[in-house]
Amino acid sequence: MDLTRQEEAILNGEQGAGRQKAMELVTALGKIYGADSLIDITSAHLSGASYKTIGDGGLKYLEDLVAGGAQVSVPSTLNPVGMDRTRWKEMHIHPEFAEKQLRIIDLYGQMGIKKTCSCTPYVGPNVPSMGDHVAWAESSALSFVNSYIGARTNREGGPGALAAAILGKTANYGLHLDDNRKPTVVIDPEIDGSVFSYSLLGQAVGMAIGSGIPYFKNISPEVEEAKALSAAMAASGSMALWHAEGITPEAGNFDISDLEVIHIGKKELENAYDKLNRTEDVQLIAIGCPHLTEKEMHQIAEFLKDKEKKNKDIEVWFCTSAEIRERCAEDVKIMERFGPVLADTCMVVAPIEGTFQRTATNSAKAGNYLPTLCSQKAMCRDITALMELVL
């Protein structure tokens, strides 16, 4: 890799141990993936924030970075953590877990990272522009900004995104390059246009192709639908970029005439649904993976406003960002008749396996991760169908 004189100085430790560690990691990744240089980034979004996922080893790594004077160089936001910072007792969290989780959040804050604790920073404080090079680590969020906004990021891991945030640079390879953003397959779907249908579509596409860059025809996703589609494809497959004809900003740049066309219809959507549903009996309904938007909060509250919770045996959690929870105070009052509106967290990175064994969700992403990361039997349905379980 060709490094500038300043980058060489960082690698040699002339700007402190924290920046040196970051440069060692970014250049190592660049060499692995064949990058010829580093590029400046405008923002970062960091995963690896839950004590459940990073453990004591991750906590020690963050402590070492802070001790080495590490500070982020670009606006940086943080992914959900393992609990609501103030309402963790309502989530059945052990005090020792809570103590270490709060320590992790504090360490990120000491490095200058905004303690947003949300997987949807693009509807809040971290909104890239088309063509911006960024380093984002949350799979659903990076797919959204790559695709719907036209920013450029690879599928960063947590340590890599943090290192890039500290440097304000990342290695120039993969989806930062024009040639690697071309679609590889055309998807011709038949869906009803609901948010849940986009989640099932993403699941079906992941099951059909696994990886690649799909180009969608005949869909018109708004933010909520694009969020669901991005999350599902990143979890059921490994897709970090998609295009939609007439919708996403780069879709008009490509000739798709020679690409394979895959039809996703009723049969494929039913197969996706069956894959995500492994129980008819649940103990927890967890809604908000990725985090609920302001529009979704309004819709849920509108549906629930004249209803009451009758099934007291099933807990209900709604997950969103602290900013949106505060902004939707009237909606929260209605929703909290059914269960807590939690911020900072989600069911996937919380230690729910200590309390629950069967969890329902509206998200194909969560439907994939609940069995593997949380030892749950999962149910996946749209929000209305889920809430009818307790009405």
Segments from the language model and where they lie:
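Non-transmembrane, aqueous-exposed alpha-helical and coiled segments at domain scale
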Residues: M1-L391
